[in-house]
């Protein structure tokens, strides 16, 4: 049955000049002609997103509809908005789009496993946003396109400004999900990441109903078919660490875990570019080519050379490109059951070990805690690192209660006998301002040892406060780096800082999950 949105949209798309499923070259050409961006010397399209250079979580809403009212975990992440307000907003957005000379439509999929994929349609006011959608979502074959029937529609009108008094929003910016109308409305922001993350939120609602765990993680596979998952918030190293020349990338950010195995929800990568270098991240560097979308990168107008060290517009500079741009990427993005899971955190206190082994209960505890430091630039208003506990390493995108996802994870770890590691890509030798960021070469060496089974052969000691198992040695990593206390000049300062962080873990868990005492027992202990 067609929703009202689809009926109204069909009328509009018939009345306006609409470009359906344009190839990359056409979209790049039109974006440049329309003044939406400029080409770099490598042929990538660089677009500036204005004042919104990150997501706007305070402007995200879910329509409070009867069919989902009792399922949604309502609160600051999933703010309710009435059906009446949604309908008023939708009507005004569609009327606004009707006044446009040109619109752009992409038809594709979310979910590489055909059993679980969601056919989607993305309607854009901007050509470059449509190019972004084409690069980030799964592109259909000609046969699939001919038979394509959208089950969820994203309508993105960045220049439309909401009126909070009329539309029930917090500001002129809005990201509104309606599960009954199968529609996402986005406006008042030009930050393209809102498209990708709104569809991820949709999948986080729909997949668990089919016994599939949706995950904010990257995934890759070794030459022997061994699959690894990397969980972590923005800036913790998911994209970087999963782009491993000795392994094959399944995907860099969003996956589902079913009884069939792991599958990429997307068809592209959305890599952070700040301080990007050919030496540090050769795969990402080479992926920035014709068809790639750069967001908010400082590009020299005269030479068209991108300056990735510059944070002129934001620290949250990005590159969006199809997963095929990574050599050896797995196409379609499906793999077997995972062997190893890595939780990534960027600990700004310099307290957590660079790598430690977790049992199932500890894995569920750290999954529910989702600790990291909020990295500057990925959200508006964050310019210095802050402690953040983001449930399941992805709380902004979870419509259901977090324990639903944690219990699914625990069950799958048990069933598949998966080994879980916690890796700190953050600070060592002290907190931010005193210590330094963990060397990427060390982190890579530790992750490699975890994936190839070398960490199964070494001795471990339990961390006195956090209870996790810390290896006493690791190939290609100095032993003193493995014990964070050893890297601090003043051991008493470390002890105080560690106790402080542990107390924050405990306080966060008790506040959010008062009924999960069995999992809480796997957390840190303060003497």
From Swiss-Prot:
Looking at the record's lineage, which domain of life comes first? Bacteria
Alphabetized PROSITE patterns for the sequence: PEPCK_ATP (PS00532)
Reaction catalysed by this enzyme: oxaloacetate + ATP = phosphoenolpyruvate + ADP + CO2
Keywords, comma-separated and alphabetical = ATP-binding, Cytoplasm, Decarboxylase, Gluconeogenesis, Lyase, Manganese, Metal-binding, Nucleotide-binding
As for family, the record states:
Belongs to the phosphoenolpyruvate carboxykinase (ATP) family.
Q: What does this protein do?
A: Involved in the gluconeogenesis. Catalyzes the conversion of oxaloacetate (OAA) to phosphoenolpyruvate (PEP) through direct phosphoryl transfer between the nucleoside triphosphate and OAA.
Which protein is depicted? Phosphoenolpyruvate carboxykinase (ATP)
What organism does the record attribute this protein to?
Answer: Brevibacillus brevis (strain 47 / JCM 6285 / NBRC 100599)
């Amino acid at each position: 049955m067609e929703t009202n949105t689809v009926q109204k949209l069909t009328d509009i798309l018939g009345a306006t000049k609409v470009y359906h499923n344009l190839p990359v070259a056409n979209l790049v050409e039109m974006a440049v002609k329309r003044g939406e961006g400029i080409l770099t010397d490598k042929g990538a399209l660089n677009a500036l997103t204005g004042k919104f250079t990150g997501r706007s979580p305070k402007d995200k809403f879910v329509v409070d509809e009867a069919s989902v009212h009792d399922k949604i975990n309502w609160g600051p992440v999933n703010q309710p908005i009435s059906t009446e307000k949604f309908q008023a907003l939708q009507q005004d957005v569609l009327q606004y789009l009707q006044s446009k000379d040109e619109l752009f439509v992409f038809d594709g999929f979310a979910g590489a496993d055909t059993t679980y994929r969601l056919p989607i349609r993305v309607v854009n006011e901007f050509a470059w946003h449509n190019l972004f959608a084409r690069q980030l979502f799964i592109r259909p074959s000609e046969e699939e396109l001919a038979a394509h029937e959208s089950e969820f529609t994203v309508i993105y009108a960045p220049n439309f400004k909401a009126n909070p008094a009329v539309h029930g929003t917090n500001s002129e910016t809005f990201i509104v999900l309606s599960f009954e109308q199968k529609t996402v409305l986005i406006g008042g922001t030009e930050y393209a990441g809102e498209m990708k993350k709104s569809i991820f939120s949709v999948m986080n609602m729909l997949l668990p109903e089919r016994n599939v765990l949706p995950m904010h993680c990257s995934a890759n596979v070794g030459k022997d078919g061994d699959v690894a998952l990397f969980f972590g918030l923005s800036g913790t190293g998911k994209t970087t660490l999963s782009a491993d020349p000795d392994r094959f990338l399944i995907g860099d950010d969003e996956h589902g875990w079913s009884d069939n195995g792991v599958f990429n929800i997307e068809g592209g990568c959305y890599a952070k570019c700040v301080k990007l270098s050919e030496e540090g991240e050769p795969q990402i560097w080479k992926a920035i080519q014709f068809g790639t979308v750069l967001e908010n990168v400082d590009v020299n107008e005269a030479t068209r050379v991108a300056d990735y060290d510059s944070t002129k517009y934001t620290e949250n500079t990005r590159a969006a490109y199809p997963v095929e741009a990574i050599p050896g990427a797995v196409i379609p993005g499906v793999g077997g059951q995972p062997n190893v899971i890595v939780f990534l955190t960027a600990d700004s206190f310099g307290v957590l070990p660079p790598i430690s082994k977790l049992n199932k209960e500890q894995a569920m505890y750290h999954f529910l805690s989702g600790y990291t430091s909020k990295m500057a630039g990925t959200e508006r208003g964050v310019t210095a690192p802050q402690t953040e506990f983001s449930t399941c390493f992805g709380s902004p995108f979870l419509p259901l209660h977090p324990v639903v996802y944690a219990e699914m994870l625990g069950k799958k770890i048990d069933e598949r006998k998966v080994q879980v590691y916690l890796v700190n890509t953050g600070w060592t030798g002290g907190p931010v301002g005193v210590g330094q960021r963990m060397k990427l070469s060390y982190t890579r060496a530790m992750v490699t040892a975890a994936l190839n089974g070398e960490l199964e052969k070494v001795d471990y000691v339990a961390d006195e406060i956090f209870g996790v198992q810390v290896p006493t040695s690791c190939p290609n990593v100095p032993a003193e780096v493995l014990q964070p206390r050893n890297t601090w000049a003043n051991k008493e300062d470390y002890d105080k800082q560690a106790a402080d962080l542990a107390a924050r873990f405990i306080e966060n868990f008790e506040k959010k999950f008062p009924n999960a005492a069995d999992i809480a027992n796997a957390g840190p202990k303060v003497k």
